[in-house]
A protein has these predicted regions:
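Surface-exposed assembly/interface segments
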Residues: 1-372
Length: 372
């Protein structure tokens, strides 16, 4: 019996700034392109030190951390040879890493999380804020455990789960998910790792996820009806069109486009970082118009950069970014918030930049033939 989609609470984070994002319809940060390979295993490595020795660093292992509560082990590798130190060439993890590093736009690292499948929630929680944003499964399958994982990603709204299956029906139970990406492809080829490696690490705002070539992945020969079914599911295939191998679309299972959600995540991450830096680098930020103006300026600065990166749309008449920033005065804050030195008067809106995915051209031909 399939595990139903259930609501779970997002993970707690150690921070002083909380940016709450709401997407209305219709209407380079480190780590935002990095990939984590999720490797559930019944036998976890034990006795590993969190401190790397010189030989391990020379081998290309970047970091290692064991969660004492769950036994889960998080490791980062700089290249495929480094992955081979811990995973043989015939393992699922190695094959996914191989596909990832085969892409020209891959990151400077790949991460692997070995965890007890019975402790998936707690294991991911321990390493949720580490240096990764996109996750794939070591063994591509859409089963009850995968559904449980998608619940976590949908609750937190700041990481993406990429699932792969050759059976389109596997994704029916996940239809409408915003932070889950479905790839319809033969699982003998690691399209998920190639997909992330080829696109995710490009500058946020600079690219769509459609039309992309994936090294080492074989395009499918699909009928019009088959491709229509994939599109209706909001899944993504790898096809050949006009002599080019390419990804068929660039959306999540909700139909929202990955580049838009990735851009929203960039804005959220950078506003949090900018405001957190202001709180920590200033001796104090006064709870008055001057301090509030400083906070407002920080948010405006991030949104302006997002516009320059083409994350935020441009007003056709003014040429400026379509965004607003509002900062309510101290007088509008509650006595409780003022007493706790908490300011909740900052808000902003923006329109995401769009991308051309298809073109219709209307032409007229003048003929010398007279039709009688």
């Amino acid at each position: 019996m399939a595990v139903p989609q259930t609501a779970v609470a997002p993970y707690q984070r150690l921070k002083d700034v909380d940016v709450v994002m709401t997407i209305n319809h219709p209407r380079e940060v480190i780590g935002l392109g990095n990939m984590l390979i999720l490797n559930p295993t019944a036998t976890l490595p034990s006795g590993l030190s969190d401190t790397l020795d010189n030989d391990e660093r020379k081998d290309g292992i970047l970091s290692r951390k064991t969660d004492s509560a769950t036994g889960a082990v998080f490791r980062e590798y700089s290249n495929l040879d480094a992955v081979a130190v811990d995973y043989d060439a015939d393992t699922a993890v190695y094959k996914k890493a191989n596909s990832y590093f085969a892409q020209s736009e891959h990151s400077d690292r790949v991460a692997v999380l070995d965890y007890d499948p019975a402790k998936a929630y707690e294991s991911l929680e321990a390493f949720w804020t580490f240096n990764w944003t996109f996750a794939i499964l070591a063994e591509s399958k859409v089963d009850d455990s995968a559904i449980t994982l998608t619940n976590i990603f949908e609750a937190n709204k700041d990481h993406f789960m990429v699932l792969q299956s050759n059976d389109l029906k596997d994704f029916d139970k996940l239809f409408g998910l915003n932070y889950t990406i479905a790839l319809k492809h033969d699982v003998a080829e690691p399209m998920d790792a190639a997909f992330v490696g080829a696109i995710a690490n490009k500058e946020v705002g600079s690219t769509t996820w459609k039309f992309k070539e994936l090294a080492g992945i074989t395009p499918e020969s699909l009928t019009t009806q088959e491709l229509a079914g994939i599109n209706n599911t909001h899944a993504i295939a790898y096809v050949r069109v006009s002599g080019h191998n390419r990804t068929s679309e660039g959306w999540t299972l909700s139909g929202e486009y990955i580049d838009s959600l990735h851009g929203i995540l960039w804005v959220q991450t950078n506003i949090e970082s900018s405001l957190e830096d202001s709180l920590q680098s200033n001796d104090k930020i006064p709870y008055d118009n001057e301090g509030i103006s400083l906070l407002r300026a920080k948010v405006t600065q991030v949104l302006q950069e997002a516009h320059e990166r083409e994350i935020i749309a441009t007003d056709d008449e003014t040429g400026r970014g379509v965004y607003t920033v509002t900062a309510a005065p101290k007088s509008s804050q509650t006595k409780q918030d003022i007493s706790k030195r908490h300011y909740e008067g900052l808000s902003f809106t923006f329109e995401t930049s769009s991308t051309v995915h298809s073109v219709t051209v209307h032409g007229t031909v003048d003929s010398d033939t007279i039709l009688v």
